Amino acid sequence: MRGCACRGTAGVAHVSCLTEQAKILVAEAKENNSDDNQGHRWYLCGLCKQDYHGDVRCALGWAVWKTYVGLPEDNRYRCCALAQLGTGLGAMGRNEEKLSILEACWDIEKRRARAGAQVDLLAIQGKIANCYGELGRHPDALRVRREILAMRRKIYAPEDLPVLHDVTNLGVSLNHLRMYTESQPLWRKYIPVARRVLGRDHNLTTTMIKGLAAAISQHGDAPRDGLLEAIKMLSENSQRLRQVLGDTHPETQQNECSLKFLRGRLACLETKDT
């Protein structure tokens, strides 16, 4: 089973091996009282540092849940495992089930009411907003994402990863609702920040670029210029995604689909002008 997005034959692993590795690393971090609890091992490839997706993400969601389900309901590891199960189900398109699980996580976290719980609540709230978007409930997703970003800015600096992540999600919601006059300046403001802080190959950077390309190709008084700019951005994005994720990764294929669509629109526009 292909366990990550690594190139060539690298990354092929059994889910049972990935599960055992995650268990060991999380247990070691807990024993050593490490600030990094290694929880990301359940959803992030240790080699290429990209998120698992599809069948693998779903299988690991069930694996992490089975690992920690016996802990008390308010135990942090159990709460995180429940959220990972929801994300895994979402990876297979089971978004109604995912939403129910995330809402249960939200209720548990609120009841815990411990120090620092705000960050965990925002993380779950973000997953709920993502699920709203996947279910086509874009106004609900936008409302929640505005709330999240407002709270996050009170906790983090503008260039911190959580803020950049929330900005990306907000921009996606604005694009879905065709609110390009708001999303376009947001993308243009934060893409240089993401490039400087995260690098050009980071998934948030490439997602922001796709978001800006969508916004400028759909909005503006100069459709041809907008299409040319968007095509240039997606072409550069395509090269990076192929190098980092490979040709068959969903993100690469989605970028290619958008690029093909915009090239088709440009060809139609130029045909009309001749």
Predicted regions and their residues:
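Intrinsic-disorder-linked linear interaction elements in eukaryotic regulatory proteins
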Residues: 8-11, 15-274
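Soluble N-terminal domains of membrane-associated systems
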Residues: 1-2
